[in-house]
Amino acid sequence: MKRTIKTQVLDRAGTLNRLTSIFVRRQYNIVSLSATPTETEGITNITFIVDVSDESSTETIIKQLEKQVNVISALDITNNNLFNRELILIKLGHPDDYQTFEKIIKPYEGQLTILKDLEDYIYIQAIGTHQTIENLLDDLKIYPVTQVSRTGSAGLL
């Protein structure tokens, strides 16, 4: 099961390495990671999306994170997370049938922007939940996707 863990840390060299090693030692996969400075200088929020086997494993991870140097707090915000979004940039081979392409992207209206429409390629930006981004990629599989760049998940309480 996927869990969203939010940490607040002092912005020091090596902190991220120490935190990720906790997951590696327990063989939990980090699905997504994002880090951003807070409004308080020297403090950073790091959000992890992690595959864990059960809730007790999540509690163990939280306790281990809280013991680390430079960690101010660690919380499982999976059930409290009001907003959770990812950003994806896609370079796509230009579709031969543009009307079909427009029908495919229509459900993502408001979440998807065509950044550049060239003769050979289309550059797309989309913002949404993890599942929305996965659905978009699945829908676009009929076209040659030549490049993808995707951020980690960002969440707010």
Residue ranges of model-derived segments:
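Long, contiguous binding/interaction regions
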Residues: M1-T4, L10-N45, V52-L157
